[in-house]
């Protein structure tokens, strides 16, 4: 029988992290929760009322009392500001569409929060992610990151930036669990109503306030606002309200008339221009990535045949990834892919194994 471990569980306030904590406790582990206070001090008054923050933290503490484990609140607002929100805004200035979870996981959640958990005596750090970790074995000397068994909920895409040290300390109790089973568990306990439906919003931006948040933040960075909407021949078709309000593949909200549907095919920060074209102009068979992290294998020095996802809901597509220096790579797909978006991540897979990934630069 394996010995009991002292395990810290990152508690977001959702049902998945609670279920992860309960599973670990049922296995005989000494479990405690850690909740990350992350709304930056400069934003608390306007974007997330202090009362709302206190209400969420009180809710988490009540959950801990009900299910028999303590929960510590860790103030990481400054770290979240510098490691997540600032690079998030900088990416928009570059005409990119960033994913803040990609910044947060390696630096803050599995970085600062994991270190705080260790300082509180944790031997392992767990989250409610639907992903798996495979320990070193006969075929690999490294910890490997794997897709979650429930592929409809798999969250491995957001975790490719983790290090070997982080993987070695991490547990994913829901890795082999189906989301519907977690929902059924909550229903059986009569607590499903405590957890609202999953939000697709960014965690530090209130629902419906995305454009307002970006506008205020970018105003402080003196980002240019209005500019031209151009077709592929350079003709001006209209005016945009700031390139940060657009993303590759967008069709709605362009405010221009055309005999055929037009889509955003490029964002050009140097010219402060939005470029539009027909749907076929969105198809590309190659891209380049930077800030590459090879999570499950040593960094290769030869091309790698694998499958690549260019967004979380994208079906992995056959491609060849060619390393370029230490932290960059080029990707060539067997078939063109639609709406390759700079700022999003390209994540490399060999079956269920996450080989690595990086940020799409162009």
Swiss-Prot record:
UniProt EC number: 2.8.1.13
The keyword Lyase is assigned to this record: no
Highest taxon, organism lineage: Bacteria
GO cellular component, as recorded: cytoplasm
Residues covered by region (Interaction with tRNA): 153-155
Pfam family, one: tRNA_Me_trans_C
Positions annotated as active site in the UniProt record: 104 (nucleophile), 203 (cysteine persulfide intermediate)
The keyword ATP-binding is annotated on this UniProt entry: yes
Broadest EC class assigned to this enzyme: transferase
Residues annotated for ATP binding in this entry: 10-17, 36, 128
Protein known as: tRNA-specific 2-thiouridylase MnmA
Organism name: Syntrophobacter fumaroxidans (strain DSM 10017 / MPOB)
